[in-house]
């Protein structure tokens, strides 16, 4: 059965479930301190083969593992676990369109920013909406934001973690507030 976005199936802690049934402790280190690392894996639907193809999956998983090591997560998952979770999640949703699959490792349970674990994972498919080909036809109205990328000495941008994207959020909000589609 194909699920709508509001009721899509996600993978959380080894189980496929409705996104609305997913639960993460609000006092977990991931909720309180942004202790997570993630990949947004582009997947492209091919009409001729009726197949979904993940783009550079191994490279994405190498970066996810590298980010987890840099942020000092104890990983219980392997690249094979990552791939199986992604495939199972996509199959559970029966999507036949381009996706960005968010694969996130996070610190759950109770604890502080120094907590060791437990390190858990969720996998969530997100329909991509417009493609770059559509943007190429219409164009994008962009601005250069006043917000700058963080320095490697502060919070390393080599770690793909949620906390590293706050500047992107405030830059995007600045662009939208000023009438632009996005920011550079």
Task: Cite the ranges covered by each PLM segment.
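Helix-start/capping segments and mature chain N-termini
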Residues: 1-74, 84-88, 112-184
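Short, acidic/charged, Gly/Pro-enriched secondary-structure junctions
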Residues: 82-110, 126
